[in-house]
Design a protein with these regions (language model features):
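Basic/polar N-terminal segments that are highly enriched at the extreme N-terminus
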Residues: 1-8, 139
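Short, basic/aromatic recognition patches
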Residues: 7-22
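Small-residue (primarily alanine) positions within well-ordered alpha-helices
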Residues: 13, 31-32, 61, 65
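Extended beta-strand/beta-hairpin segments
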Residues: 20-25, 109
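Short glycine/proline-enriched turns and hinge-like loops at secondary-structure junctions
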Residues: 25-26, 55
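Short beta-strand scaffold segments in enzyme catalytic cores
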Residues: 28-35, 112
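Zn2+-dependent cytidine deaminase-like catalytic core
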Residues: 42-137
Length: 139
């Protein structure tokens, strides 16, 4: 991916982060998932008092996209920080999100974990989830 594309996706993730509902952890996460068709879907984390129904930003973006008919993706940007603080660390997807993303992005999905538009790590889902289990395993 070109630097301008990476930065644009990071900006979308920051825009999504503003809508996070995090009254328990106070850690807000934003994600921007790009379909292979170029369409971008934003997601934020949404917490729940009973914790189990809590949904991560990455899966929020993924579920929005799939529910609108998009099922192939090439990149996701993720940002996260404590509420009221600037992003001081990179936030990677949790294990559940890695598995959910693997279903639709496979090991080649580009994963951008960012502190800012200029400070970020670019890797692949295959690096974050080696030997991932996907649809091909069931054929």
């Amino acid at each position: 991916m070109e630097k301008a594309e990476i930065q644009a996706l990071i900006r979308e993730a920051f825009a999504a982060q503003k809508f996070a509902y995090v009254p328990y952890s106070h850690f807000h996460v934003g994600a921007a998932l790009r379909g292979k068709n170029g369409q971008v879907f934003r997601g934020c984390n949404i917490e729940n008092a009973s914790y189990t129904p809590t949904n991560c930003a990455e899966r929020t973006a993924l579920f929005k996209a799939v529910s609108e008919g998009v099922r192939e993706f090439d990149a996701i940007a993720i940002v996260g920080s404590k509420v009221g603080e600037t992003n001081t660390l990179v936030t990677g997807p949790c294990g559940v999100c890695r598995q959910a993303l693997y279903e639709f992005g496979g090991p080649e999905l580009t994963v951008i974990m960012a502190r800012s538009e200029d400070v970020y790590i670019v890797t692949t889902l295959g690096d974050l989830l080696p030997y991932g289990f996907g649809p091909a395993n069931l054929e």
